[in-house]
């Protein structure tokens, strides 16, 4: 089960920023991590880094004081996903995700697998429509509605399955809060501070725009990880969010 101190720590990190780690070298990743403060952000570990470095890397980040969002987007038969989610909870992660397109039975099985963990269970969220996808991409999959409509369908399915929230585009946030309620967590990639390169995320917003739209957690990668002074960049984003909230 999770370290007893992890849940208390999860509750003390107030920052909505989740930094997406994207390194081919564990040494480079840790060199970056050691330049930032765990009170300023959480960290996201995706498929590439988890495959390269394994659960031990997640534990190393936790030992440095960071909450970890394990972004593996589980999508399989219900029993397999349930066991995978339970394994993530055993690892002590703060958040884990599945693909909503796996269906309600799969999501319910995943949620039920976390019941034994009680208050120590990670947040369980589902991926709706990837932020790199537009209407043409969906049409190629035989889906004839807009990304926003598809995201809403999958978000409602996720909410009805008892999960904590979804990964979505910031452009859908306001509508999803209306449909699924204010307690339903929205996690948004494709966030770029003003002046940043758009990269491969087509549907983007700035942190302040995302916050105003109702986003709970914003995933930011290269604008922070490639910054000459990532700690300062994080501070500037947090200040902009505080100013945006008070304006």
Swiss-Prot record:
The active site is at residue 73. Substrate binds at residues 22, 44, 71-80, 131, 192, 201, 221-222. Its EC number is 4.1.1.23. Keywords: Decarboxylase, Lyase, Pyrimidine biosynthesis. SUPFAM superfamilies: Ribulose-phoshate binding barrel. It is an enzyme of class 4 (lyase). GO terms for molecular function: orotidine-5'-phosphate decarboxylase activity. It holds the Pfam family OMPdecase. GO terms for biological process: 'de novo' pyrimidine nucleobase biosynthetic process; 'de novo' UMP biosynthetic process. CDD domains: OMP_decarboxylase_like. The keyword Lyase applies. PROSITE patterns: OMPDECASE. Pathway: Pyrimidine metabolism; UMP biosynthesis via de novo pathway; UMP from orotate: step 2/2. It catalyses: orotidine 5'-phosphate + H(+) = UMP + CO2. GO terms for cellular component: cytosol. It comes from the Bacteria. Belongs to the OMP decarboxylase family. Type 1 subfamily. Catalyzes the decarboxylation of orotidine 5'-monophosphate (OMP) to uridine 5'-monophosphate (UMP). Homodimer. This is Orotidine 5'-phosphate decarboxylase. It comes from Pectobacterium carotovorum subsp. carotovorum (strain PC1).
């Amino acid at each position: 089960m999770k370290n007893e101190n992890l849940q208390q720590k999860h509750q003390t990190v107030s920052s909505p920023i989740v930094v997406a780690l994207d390194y081919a070298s564990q040494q480079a990743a840790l060199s970056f991590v050691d330049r930032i403060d765990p009170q300023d952000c959480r960290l996201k570990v995706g498929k590439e880094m988890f495959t390269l470095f394994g659960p031990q890397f997640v534990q190393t980040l936790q030992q440095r004081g960071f909450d970890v969002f394990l972004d593996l987007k589980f999508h399989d038969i219900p029993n397999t996903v349930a066991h995978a989610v339970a394994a993530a909870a055993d690892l002590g992660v703060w958040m884990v995700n599945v693909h909503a397109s796996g269906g309600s039975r799969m999501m319910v099985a995943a949620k039920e697998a976390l019941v034994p963990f009680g208050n120590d269970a990670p947040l369980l969220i589902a991926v709706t429509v990837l932020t790199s996808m537009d209407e043409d991409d969906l049409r190629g999959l035989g889906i004839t509605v807009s990304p926003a409509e598809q995201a809403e369908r999958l978000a409602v399915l996720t909410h009805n399955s008892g999960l904590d929230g979804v990964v979505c585009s910031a452009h859908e946030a306001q509508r999803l809060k209306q449909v699924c309620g204010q307690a339903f967590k929205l996690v948004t990639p494709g966030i770029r501070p003003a002046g940043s390169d758009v990269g491969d995320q087509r549907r983007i917003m700035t942190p302040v725009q995302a916050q105003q739209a109702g986003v709970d957690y914003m995933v930011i990668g290269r604008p922070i990880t490639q910054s000459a002074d990532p700690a300062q960049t994080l501070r500037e984003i947090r200040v902009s969010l505080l100013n945006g909230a008070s304006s």
